Amino acid sequence: MVTIGNTHDDLIHDAVLDYYGKRLATCSSDKTIKIFEIDGDNHKLVETLRGHEGPVWQVSWAHPKFGSIIASASYDGKVFIWREENGRWTNIAQHQHNASVNSVVWAPQEYGPLLLCASSDGNVSVVEFKEGGNCEATTFAAHDVGANSASWAPPAVSGSLIQPINGKASNNIRIVTGGCDNLVKIWKYDPSSKTYVIEETLSGHKDWVRDVAWSSSVLSKSYIASASQDKTVIVWTQEGNQPWKKKLLQDIPFPDVVWKVSWSLSGNVLAVSGGDNKVTLWKENLTGEWESAGVVEE
């Protein structure tokens, strides 16, 4: 286990390992991003990235096939794209929203170098990063009061272990968003209009949806988890083209606001974290019920 000490001057909001688990990016209310090299239980700070004018909420590593690249999202309404070359990190591109950018995540590599952003201005944007630092954004209104989180669907369809035929993943892109309207929304890319159109609106929460996560599992069902300020987590499932079904992760509310949901790489274990400073792990049993798989206390 690697413990990062007092390297930031304020709260740390996100910490993400790169594809190989060799580098860690952290971001903080001190307006900086820090890059660490990880070697076993040891770590070394190698770079501090500055430029944001507000708290940095989230960071995301691009797949290494696109280079050594991270994106950062900040309260200042900006998304920065940073690239490392010859040991030096530089800010190579920027993307602007009209309010805090709360979520930023690179797409699965099959979709290409696409960046998904959710903002308090109510909009969600998908930014295509091009060589030379140029970016082309598709922006659409998603949640009237503000968008808090967004997540990519896996590139293969549920029920299949293969990728889309002819590799045309761009024709099958779907995303899920969560917002301050208490709703979870599923969007699909429409090649004819070159934008994202609403495919499904899922209602079930009674307060802001703080986080959404689409499981990478491509077996019999699609899974989406949503975490809310109403102290609940809902797992939404879909088999084939059937309607989405909702199920509370547990019948009683969590002790505090639920801030974050995250699926394991295999897509079958769900981690839940909230205001009670605990991380709980959950797994679906053979009857479709969700059972506790452990607790991590801070």
Swiss-Prot record:
Location (main, coarse): membrane
Location of this chain's protein in the cell: Cytoplasmic vesicle, COPII-coated vesicle membrane; Endoplasmic reticulum membrane; Nucleus, Nuclear pore complex
GO MF, one example: structural molecule activity
Membrane topology: Peripheral membrane protein
Keyword terms, alphabetized: Cytoplasmic vesicle, Endoplasmic reticulum, ER-Golgi transport, Membrane, mRNA transport, Nuclear pore complex, Nucleus, Protein transport, Repeat, Translocation, Transport, WD repeat
Cysteine pairings via disulfide bonds: none
Gene Ontology CC entries for this record: COPII vesicle coat; endoplasmic reticulum membrane; GATOR2 complex; nuclear pore outer ring
SUPFAM superfamilies: WD40 repeat-like
Pfam families the UniProt entry points to: WD40
InterPro entries reported for this sequence: Sec13/Seh1_fam, WD40/YVTN_repeat-like_dom_sf, WD40_repeat_dom_sf, WD40_rpt
PROSITE patterns: WD_REPEATS_2, WD_REPEATS_REGION
Protein's GO biological process: COPII-coated vesicle budding; mRNA transport; positive regulation of TOR signaling; protein exit from endoplasmic reticulum; protein import into nucleus
WD repeats (start-end): 7-46, 51-92, 96-139, 142-197, 204-246, 253-292
Quaternary structure and partners: The COPII coat is composed of at least 5 proteins: the SEC23/24 complex, the SEC13/31 complex, and the protein SAR1. Component of the nuclear pore complex (NPC). NPC constitutes the exclusive means of nucleocytoplasmic transport. NPCs allow the passive diffusion of ions and small molecules and the active, nuclear transport receptor-mediated bidirectional transport of macromolecules such as proteins, RNAs, ribonucleoparticles (RNPs), and ribosomal subunits across the nuclear envelope. Due to its 8-fold rotational symmetry, all subunits are present with 8 copies or multiples thereof.
Family: Belongs to the WD repeat SEC13 family.
Function: Component of the coat protein complex II (COPII) which promotes the formation of transport vesicles from the endoplasmic reticulum (ER). The coat has two main functions, the physical deformation of the endoplasmic reticulum membrane into vesicles and the selection of cargo molecules. It also functions as a component of the nuclear pore complex (NPC). NPC components, collectively referred to as nucleoporins (NUPs), can play the role of both NPC structural components and of docking or interaction partners for transiently associated nuclear transport factors.
The protein's name in its UniProt record: Protein transport protein SEC13
Lineage, uppermost ranks: Eukaryota, Fungi, Dikarya, Ascomycota, Saccharomycotina
